[in-house]
């Protein structure tokens, strides 16, 4: 049995002058009926609420102010789920709406609860349709058009594959719309991905979405580090949808690492929000990166922010480059007290245990 997550971008769902949003959803749903009939499982991560809300309210360009964005998302979400329900019901498919914000993944308990709910839904042969809760989330509208969320969902349910449907055929060496010499990139191994991502080799400047190719590369990095294969595919081509579910190699394939970091450390690395920062000396940085050691107080040079036990912090080296994230074993006040020599014989105290420390 396979479990796949499919992220459908705004640029796909808005359709064209010839194809309505309902027809787009119809084409997609018909393409995976055979996949589901074999006992496989599917979760959709959908964008499009803001875009559809703007259509409904006759707003011609994507709003810039938060209140209008949230208002159009509220209107569009109703329309979006109505279309999904209408189309999927015709095919005898049951769906469920799941609205998520960053805060829902911020604690281990809530992350696990979301994971259990999603897994139970697919066990019941229900297709969960996940979207960010744009109506109440402010930071969420800058999250990357659901790209990052789709990777976290894939990790939460231990998916085999994450498919990113977009409006380009595959990843390119340059933006093909502005560079005639742009070369398609068909395969990317995890060891190559960070360099490609950091170069930000291409951006898709689509006003209706909040993400471009850069957010999809971030999503691919998150998923592949957690052991999930990622496929970037042009979802505007109906033939591609059929090819995907025949498991054919189209678009760009991002291969997962051979030794995934695991569900818990994936959560630490990508889902949790940090509340402070700890700067390490060179020795401590080497020890946690190369030896898998816990972070001890003796290796700490500086502390920023206020945090209590079990809150998440960013861990950086002397050049302020992120080394890891982790959950602290002591408070910021206690750690500052140790650094200021107000307490003796505490330099070997564990600040972040290696079991709750995830390398960046």
Curated annotation (Swiss-Prot):
Regarding protein family, the annotation reads: Belongs to the glutamate 5-kinase family.
- Name of the protein: Glutamate 5-kinase
Q: Which NCBIfam families match?
A: proB
Please provide, alphabetically and separated by semicolons, the GO molecular function terms listed in this UniProt record: ATP binding; glutamate 5-kinase activity; RNA binding
- What's the source species for this entry? Prochlorococcus marinus (strain AS9601)
Give the encoding gene's name.
proB
Q: In which pathway does it act?
A: Amino-acid biosynthesis; L-proline biosynthesis; L-glutamate 5-semialdehyde from L-glutamate: step 1/2
GO CC annotation: cytosol
Amino-acid positions noted as binding substrate in the UniProt annotation, renumbered to this chain: 47, 134, 146
A Pfam short name? AA_kinase
Q: Which UniProt keywords apply?
A: Amino-acid biosynthesis, ATP-binding, Cytoplasm, Kinase, Nucleotide-binding, Proline biosynthesis, Transferase
Q: What is its main location?
A: cytoplasm
Q: What subcellular compartments does it reside in?
A: Cytoplasm
Do you know which SMART domains this protein is assigned to?
PUA
State which Enzyme Commission number(s) the record gives: 2.7.2.11
UniProt-listed PANTHER family: GLUTAMATE 5-KINASE
UniProt domain PUA: residue ranges: 275-356
Function (record text): Catalyzes the transfer of a phosphate group to glutamate to form L-glutamate 5-phosphate.
């Amino acid at each position: 049995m396979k479990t796949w997550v499919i992220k459908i971008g705004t640029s796909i769902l808005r359709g064209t002058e010839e194809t309505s949003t309902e027809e787009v959803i119809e084409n997609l749903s018909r393409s995976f009926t055979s996949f589901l009939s074999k006992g496989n499982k599917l979760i959709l991560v959908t964008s499009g609420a803001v875009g559809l809300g703007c259509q409904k309210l006759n707003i011609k360009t994507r709003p810039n102010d938060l209140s209008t964005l949230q208002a159009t998302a509220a209107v569009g979400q109703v329309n979006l789920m109505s279309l999904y329900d209408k189309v999927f019901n015709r095919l005898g498919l049951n769906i469920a709406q799941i609205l998520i914000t960053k805060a829902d993944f911020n604690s281990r308990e809530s992350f696990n609860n979301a994971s259990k709910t999603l897994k139970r839904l697919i066990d019941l042969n229900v297709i969960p349709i996940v979207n960010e809760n744009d109506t109440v989330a402010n930071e969420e509208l800058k999250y990357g058009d659901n790209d990052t969320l789709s990777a976290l969902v894939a990790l939460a349910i231990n998916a085999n594959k994450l498919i990113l449907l977009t409006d380009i055929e595959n990843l390119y060496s340059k933006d093909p719309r502005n560079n005639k010499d742009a070369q398609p990139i068909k395969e990317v191994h995890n060891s190559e991905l960070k360099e490609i991502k950091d170069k930000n080799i291409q951006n898709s400047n689509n006003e209706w979405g909040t993400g471009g190719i850069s957010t999809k590369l971030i999503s691919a990095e998150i998923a592949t580090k957690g052991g999930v294969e990622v496929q970037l595919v042009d979802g505007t081509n109906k033939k591609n949808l059929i090819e995907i579910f025949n498991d054919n190699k189209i678009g760009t394939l991002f291969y997962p690492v051979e030794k995934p970091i695991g569900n818990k450390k994936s959560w630490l690395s990508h889902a949790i929000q940090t509340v402070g920062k700890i700067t390490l000396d060179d020795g401590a940085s080497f020890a946690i990166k190369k030896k898998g050691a816990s972070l001890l107080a003796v290796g700490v040079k500086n502390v920023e922010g206020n945090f209590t036990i079990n809150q998440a912090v960013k861990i950086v080296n002397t050049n302020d480059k992120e080394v890891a994230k982790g959950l602290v074993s002591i408070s910021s006040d206690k750690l500052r007290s140790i650094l200021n020599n107000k307490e003796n014989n505490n330099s070997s105290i564990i600040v972040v245990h290696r079991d709750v420390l995830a390398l960046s």
